[in-house]
């Protein structure tokens, strides 16, 4: 079977880092792109100075579907030359998102293997937004 050029980016071309490496990179100024749903993000996310939540998949009455505006939303907030870490709950969605970003020309993007669950397992700092008031 032949493969089209548009789908030529393979997972092997995507760089993955573990959560310990990710924590160090975040401390050195990398941006964190959390691709989980907004509800997952609000329940808890890694502590990072520069963090953005853009879901890769959306919950619908029919189940989860890919966010068709994902690349457009990312490009409105992040530059292809930025140092970006991409994470999700376990590493599956972020791997797909990272693969798509690499194919779209993002040069310094890395997948966070293990995702938020691994971050929590390592007892790294987290933030939650469930109980916080929206204004002072």
Curated annotation (Swiss-Prot):
Keyword set includes Secreted: no
SUPFAM superfamilies: Rhodanese/Cell cycle control phosphatase
Highest taxon, organism lineage: Eukaryota
Molecular function in Gene Ontology: thiosulfate-cyanide sulfurtransferase activity
Active site: 88 (cysteine persulfide intermediate)
InterPro entries: Rhodanese-like_dom, Rhodanese-like_dom_sf, STR17/STR18/HARC1-like
Catalysed reaction, written as an equation: thiosulfate + hydrogen cyanide = thiocyanate + sulfite + 2 H(+)
Family annotation (Pfam families): Rhodanese
EC number of the protein: 2.8.1.1
Record domain Rhodanese: where: 26-128
Subcellular location: Cytoplasm
Main location class: cytoplasm
Keywords associated with the record: Cytoplasm, Transferase
GO cellular component assignments: cytoplasm
Top EC class, one word: transferase
Functional description taken from the UniProt entry: Catalyzes the transfer of a sulfur ion from a donor to cyanide or to other thiol compounds. Substrate preference is thiosulfate > 3-mercaptopyruvate.
Record protein name field: Thiosulfate sulfurtransferase 18
Organism this protein belongs to: Arabidopsis thaliana
Taxonomic lineage of the native organism: Eukaryota, Viridiplantae, Streptophyta, Embryophyta, Tracheophyta
Record gene name: STR18
